[in-house]
């Protein structure tokens, strides 16, 4: 496997993973013993940057210095503060992507520069472009953005000879998608998608944490809502209970010294049974049933057309999810590909296809949203504005190009303001505004007539929109990427973000053996009569370990840990 390798990345809300294809099969590249990595970034009290498990471990203790679930803010103008630093969602995602890049490079033994990254099928155009920007900040050329349920179907369908229609139900930590996919002779064709980019395990945790908070207040008379650290610990307890309830009928939520009253410590100890939990999340789960039906309707299918139902995402371990999907489809769900790894594995397959590896699969995807512009329509009452004219309808196969001709409202009009929207509402302003720009200097084809403009939408394989306009009178054209008009980072901003990321190197965590080794060395330095040269060797080894950790250089860190072990063996013998 050469430096031309393209890696596949599942950039998840709560967990992320990286994969490649080896021997015609996709494999997860683990980070030490972890096959999936928490999508968490933090700044330690010592000013060290933490990514993954080390950041997650500090979250309950220092929520103000830790960022989780940043994926939900991709494509927005929200910023987050860590210490003295202010970051965009793209910046935080770049921390995670850089760590996954490092994991891949450690396994492959060479630099990695290209990637395929997955996103929810229902991600907006702006969120998709933000994901590409995050990859660029992390030093990755993003070769393709593909939808998560599509990636899972690609992993599932690899080398399967039988033709089948598969419903992919993808419920992760922060987003939900359902897709209808046809697998025919190595072609993976998406027929329809539907979903919700703000529905997942995080929401279940929040509901259960609120249930625990109310139980704690009822028992102790203390309201924890304004105690950020206590609420983070409640959320952590809720997540543990949720996971345990997937395999047990009841579970205990326990957190010692959660608060104090009158100088006395107060502990959380609440039992939750599975029926209670299912009651809390019932309405959210029911909303996914609507998405299943909508996807079937859009694909012009019924449940009788389905051959398989594939469950993807960590939240599909919840028994109530299985029951709902079985009831909604009439089929027993399958988990033939690991639910938490399926998306990353599919990304690895798509990456291998782009890299030219001999993979017998072709991916055909769709756009989940309609795309159009605001227009005015003539009615019996006169002109009515804020109407929505759709150029590309939802569930159109991508890539796709569509165009339409629009006229000005009156002969002398030489300027139009083009507002580009994404959504399904007939009132334009009720949809998501992707951007707007002015087109001036319009000329009619013949004097006294209305000027006419051809508007062309081109949606590429990444689901990113290009808009072109053509003045039929003057022949002048203009073109722009829709997201360049709204929330997209400029090239200068990306360069600045790359510089910030380079300066904010994550500190590698030591495992238990490494911590013990460093601790032994420090005790030897403090308590033993050492020759100056021996003490100097120990000090140098500790300094080099610390430097490698700060630089995120794991091979160098391991080399110096081995050197330290040899030194201690000689000194302690």
What is each residue range found by the language model?
Residues 1-76, 80-86, 95, 104-573:
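Oxyanion-binding/catalytic loops of NTP- or PPi-dependent enzymes
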Residues 98:
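Conserved cytochrome P450 K-helix/beta-meander segment immediately N-terminal to the heme-binding cysteine loop
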């Amino acid at each position: 496997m050469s430096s031309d390798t393209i890696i596949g990345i599942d950039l998840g809300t709560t967990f992320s993973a990286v994969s490649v294809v080896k021997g015609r099969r996709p494999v997860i590249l683990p980070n030490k013993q972890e096959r999936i990595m928490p999508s968490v970034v933090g700044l330690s009290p010592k000013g060290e940057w933490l990514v993954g498990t080390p950041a997650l471990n500090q979250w309950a203790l220092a929520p103000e210095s830790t960022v989780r679930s940043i994926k939900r803010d991709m494509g927005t103008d929200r910023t987050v503060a860590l210490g003295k630093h202010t970051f965009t969602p793209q910046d935080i995602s770049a921390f995670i992507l850089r760590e996954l890049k490092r994991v891949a490079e450690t396994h492959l033994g060479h630099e990695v520069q290209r990637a395929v990254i997955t996103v929810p099928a229902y991600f907006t155009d702006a969120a998709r472009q933000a994901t590409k920007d995050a990859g660029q900040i992390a030093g990755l050329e993003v070769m393709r953005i593909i939808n998560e349920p599509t990636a899972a179907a690609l992993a599932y369908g690899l080398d399967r000879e039988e033709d089948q229609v598969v419903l992919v139900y993808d419920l992760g930590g922060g987003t939900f998608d359902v897709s209808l996919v046809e697998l025919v002779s190595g072609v993976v064709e998406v027929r329809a998608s539907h979903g919700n980019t703000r529905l997942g395990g995080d929401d279940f945790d929040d509901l259960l944490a609120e249930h625990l908070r109310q139980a704690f207040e009822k028992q102790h008379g203390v309201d924890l809502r304004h105690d950020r650290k206590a609420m983070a610990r409640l959320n952590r307890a809720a997540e543990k209970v949720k996971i345990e309830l997937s395999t047990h009928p009841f579970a205990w939520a326990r957190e010692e010294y959660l608060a104090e009253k009158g100088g006395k410590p107060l502990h959380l100890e609440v039992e939750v049974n599975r029926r209670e939990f299912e009651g809390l999340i019932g309405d959210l789960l029911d909303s996914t049933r609507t998405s299943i039906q909508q996807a079937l309707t859009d694909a012009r299918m019924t449940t009788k057309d389905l051959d398989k139902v594939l469950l993807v995402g960590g939240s599909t371990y919840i028994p109530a999810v299985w029951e709902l999907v079985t009831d909604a489809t009439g089929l027993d769900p399958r988990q033939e590909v690991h639910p938490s790894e399926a998306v990353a594995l599919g990304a690895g397959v798509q990456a291998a296809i782009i890299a030219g590896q001999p993979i017998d699969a072709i991916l055909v995807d769709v756009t989940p949203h309609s795309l159009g512009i605001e227009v005015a329509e003539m009615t019996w009452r006169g002109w009515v504005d804020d109407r929505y004219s759709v150029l590309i309808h939802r569930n159109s196969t991508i890539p796709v190009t569509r165009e339409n001709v629009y006229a000005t409202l009156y002969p002398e009009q030489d300027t139009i303001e083009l507002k580009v929207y994404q959504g399904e509402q007939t009132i334009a302003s009720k949809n998501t505004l992707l951007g707007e720009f002015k087109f001036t200097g319009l000329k009619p084809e013949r004097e006294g007539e209305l000027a006419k403009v051809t508007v062309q939408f081109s949606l590429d394989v990444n689901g990113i929109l290009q808009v072109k306009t053509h003045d039929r009178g003057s022949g002048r054209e203009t073109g722009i990427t829709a997201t360049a008009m709204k929330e997209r980072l400029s090239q200068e901003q990306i360069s600045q973000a790359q510089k910030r990321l380079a300066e904010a190197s994550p500190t590698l965590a030591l495992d238990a053996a490494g911590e013990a080794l460093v601790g032994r060395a420090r005790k030897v330095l403090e308590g033993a009569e050492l020759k100056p040269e021996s003490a100097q060797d120990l000090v140098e080894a500790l300094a080099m370990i610390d430097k490698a950790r700060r630089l995120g250089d794991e091979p160098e860190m391991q080399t110096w840990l081995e050197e330290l072990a040899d030194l201690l063996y000689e000194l302690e013998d």
